[in-house]
A protein has these predicted regions:
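A C-terminal junction/extension of Radical SAM enzymes
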Residues: 150-227
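Conserved non-cysteine loop/helix-boundary elements of the Radical SAM core domain that shape
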Residues: 1-175
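Radical SAM enzyme core and accessory elements
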Residues: 203-273
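Alpha-helical structural motif
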Residues: 28, 171, 192, 247-254
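Short, glycine-/Ser/Thr-/acidic-enriched flexible segments
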Residues: 17, 194, 230-233
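A short acidic (Asp/Glu
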Residues: 121-122, 199, 237
Length: 273
């Protein structure tokens, strides 16, 4: 329904697209370019996410297809915490993946961290910020911990208690000061469900490196066409009214009902024209 429509931004993420093999990534990105006009695209982002999923071959594929922004998300640069929350990548792998992306070149690199992780206090956050400052990303997203019910972290908290979560005004301040030292300014913030404490997620960026998609999705002033299990297509009408069309979250069920999902979304998009 939206083939050859004008696009402002393309964002592939929400999970970790770089878990795909290089050939699969190549096929996905080639299909996008074959079916949509990229002539007006101002921003093309792929979440590289976990450092252990990043290889030079995958980065070369992203660059070949014109991806200009990637996100490498350590969450913390403390190895023990990474093990505790079920992250396979080590701090060293994060540094290696970042250096590899810089060597390939052509990418704006964002990094995500999470404040309020179990047993992490001010010293741990300071260490993470210092490690990130040494790498010099173009932007930084500071998340306050949101606890997902089915996660390894959720089970750990059930056993050890919420008092292990130590996000405070001071840890938020440490992150903000670190971003400022990198020449970044805050440009968007949002809250989400199940967050620990009365905090928010804040995006920081150096001048001119702000994420267009992040701004558009927060302001809810532009239609977003989403594809994939758990994705939500959002239609913004001229009168400001917003309607949503959700795909089922379960991957197996999504595959089983793919024809139904496509037909439903086609009808939704056609109705919104």
């Amino acid at each position: 329904a939206y083939k050859n429509r004008v696009l402002d931004s393309v964002y592939i993420g929400g999970g970790t697209p770089t878990t795909l093999e290089p050939a699969q990534l190549d096929r996905l990105l080639a299909a996008l370019r074959a079916n949509f006009d990229f002539g007006t695209v101002q921003e093309f982002t792929v979440e590289a996410g976990r450092a252990d999923s990043i290889t030079k071959e995958k980065l070369d594929v992203l660059k070949k297809h014109g991806v200009g922004r990637i996100s490498i998300n350590p969450q913390t640069m403390n190895g023990e915490t990474l093990k505790l929350i079920g992250r396979q990548a080590t701090p060293e792998q994060v540094r290696e993946a970042f250096a590899m992306a810089r060597a390939v070149g052509g990418f704006h690199i964002n990094m995500d961290i999470i404040l309020g992780l179990p047993n992490e206090g001010e010293a741990d956050v300071t260490h993470t910020i210092e490690e990130i400052a040494a790498m010099k990303p173009d932007s930084l997203t500071v998340h306050s911990l949101a606890i997902k019910r089915a996660s390894q972290l959720s089970k750990w908290i059930e056993e050890n208690g919420m008092e292990t979560l130590k996000n405070t005004d001071r840890t938020m301040e440490i992150a903000a000061q670190g971003a400022e030292k990198l020449g970044m300014h805050p440009y968007y913030l949002y809250r989400q469900k199940n967050m620990s404490g009365n905090f928010e997620n804040v995006g920081y960026a150096t001048e001119g490196k702000e994420g267009l998609y992040n701004i558009l999705i927060m302001e809810e002033k532009q239609t977003i066409v989403a594809c994939g299990a758990g994705s939500i297509t959002k239609m913004v009408y001229p009168d400001g009214r917003i309607e949503r069309c959700e795909d089922v979250k379960d991957v197996a069920l999504y595959i089983e009902k793919i024809d139904e999902m496509i037909a439903r979304k086609r009808g939704f998009l056609k109705y919104g024209e």
